[in-house]
């Protein structure tokens, strides 16, 4: 996790796109062009338990998740936000969904309203990655 952490902490203002690019750069060379073929992924439904699997998952599916989240948030009433907000991300994986919401809050200058993010995930290593992604 150290190598990933070093790449991520070097970013001035972390975004989901930064995470995707970092994971692509850290994907094992045998899977750079086809990260979805990494055996531990099991077509993206496996409980991930190692760093290569985490990197390959984001390299393979991160862009798709980011687009889906942005699409879901495009009609969100950002102008109606006032008061504190908490995100509860159940089954957060590496924190992709929460990161996309945070990116949207940054774009709408609403980050000051976000008071807490609660991450819930059965994979310890994925949860650790989510914590890195959302605290840097």
Predicted regions located by residue number:
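N-terminal auxiliary segments of SAM/dcSAM-dependent transferases
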Residues: 1-40
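Class I SAM-dependent methyltransferase Rossmann-like catalytic core
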Residues: 45-79
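Active-site catalytic pocket residues across diverse enzymes, especially alpha/beta-hydrolases
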Residues: 76-77, 105-109, 134
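Conserved class I S-adenosyl-L-methionine
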Residues: 84-93
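Conserved SAM-binding loop of SAM-dependent methyltransferases across substrates and taxa
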Residues: 94-111
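Short beta-strand element of Class I
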Residues: 115-118
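Conserved SAM/SAH-binding beta-strand->alpha-helix loop
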Residues: 123
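S-adenosyl-L-methionine
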Residues: 128-136
């Amino acid at each position: 996790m150290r190598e990933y952490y070093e790449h991520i902490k070097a970013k001035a203002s972390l975004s989901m796109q930064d995470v995707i690019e970092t994971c692509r750069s850290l994907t094992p060379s045998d899977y750079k062009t086809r990260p979805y073929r990494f055996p531990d992924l099991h077509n993206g439904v496996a409980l991930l338990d190692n760093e290569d699997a985490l990197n390959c998952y984001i390299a393979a599916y991160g862009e798709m998740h980011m687009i889906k989240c942005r699409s879901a948030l495009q009609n969100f009433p950002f102008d109606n936000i006032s008061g504190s907000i908490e995100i509860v991300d159940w089954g957060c994986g590496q924190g992709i969904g929460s990161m996309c919401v945070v990116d949207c809050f940054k774009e709408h200058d609403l980050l000051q309203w976000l008071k807490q993010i609660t991450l819930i995930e059965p994979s310890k290593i994925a949860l650790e990655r989510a914590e890195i992604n959302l605290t840097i």
